[in-house]
Amino acid sequence: MHIIELTALCLLAKKNPPKYPSELIHTSGGILKHPYTYVLLNNMHKKGLVEKHFENSADQFNSERPFYIITVKGKLKLEDFLKRFGLVLA
């Protein structure tokens, strides 16, 4: 697991996690960048680490806006990684 994927999983595992890619970018403190975050989340979705859902957007185009939630598999992978360093997911 690389640091960018780890950052996204940590942010999604918080008690009140950011769910939209733009919120993830903002809360990462500059670690996640705009174009790469969308590719990262799609790759993590393919691996089964996050679930992708859609919500109706109130914008002028009436499009659906994707949001992401960490899966059990993603949480287990994160906990396993943190255990190697003696850390616990709170």
Residue spans for each PLM region:
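Amphipathic alpha-helical dimerization/coiled-coil segments
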Residues: K75-A90
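Beta-hairpin "wing" of winged helix-turn-helix
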Residues: K47-N62
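Short acidic, hydrophobic short linear motifs in intrinsically disordered regions
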Residues: P17-S28
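Short amphipathic alpha-helical interaction segments
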Residues: I31-K46
